[in-house]
């Protein structure tokens, strides 16, 4: 009897852990309400820009400067992205911690695995 009770409690704890680890998914417009969360932002990339310093910006929810959200790829990580223009016009899922930069939400992307084309 104790074994069955323990097994049932273990299965419940395991299920609760799996649910807790599932990341929330938001649109570009919703991201600003979830600053500080580790989440996934899924939306269409409306513009891709690479700065003279090598930083890459994927603007979602509108074109710069009216975008709702930005996936920022620092120049130190940009080498992992051989063709950032491939994201333009496509729906992507960007995962990481949502932060604010100049009043707009962003996720800093340091690994190619953080962006998935849907």
Each language-model region and where it sits:
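Bacterial N-terminal signal peptides that target proteins for export
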Residues: 1-8
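Bacterial N-terminal signal peptides
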Residues: 8-16
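OB-fold and OB-like single-stranded nucleic-acid-recognition modules
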Residues: 18-118
């Amino acid at each position: 009897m104790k074994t069955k009770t323990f097994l049932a409690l273990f299965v419940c704890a395991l299920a609760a852990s799996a649910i807790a680890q599932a990341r929330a998914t938001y649109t570009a417009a919703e991201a600003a309400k979830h600053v500080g969360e580790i989440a996934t932002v899924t939306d269409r990339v409306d513009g891709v820009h690479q700065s003279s310093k090598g930083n890459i910006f994927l603007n979602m929810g509108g074109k710069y400067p009216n975008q709702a959200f930005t996936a920022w790829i620092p120049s130190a990580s940009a080498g992992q992205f051989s063709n950032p223009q491939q994201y333009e016009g496509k729906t992507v899922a960007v995962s990481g911690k949502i932060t604010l930069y100049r009043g707009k939400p962003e996720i800093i992307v340091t690994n190619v695995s953080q962006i998935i084309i849907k």
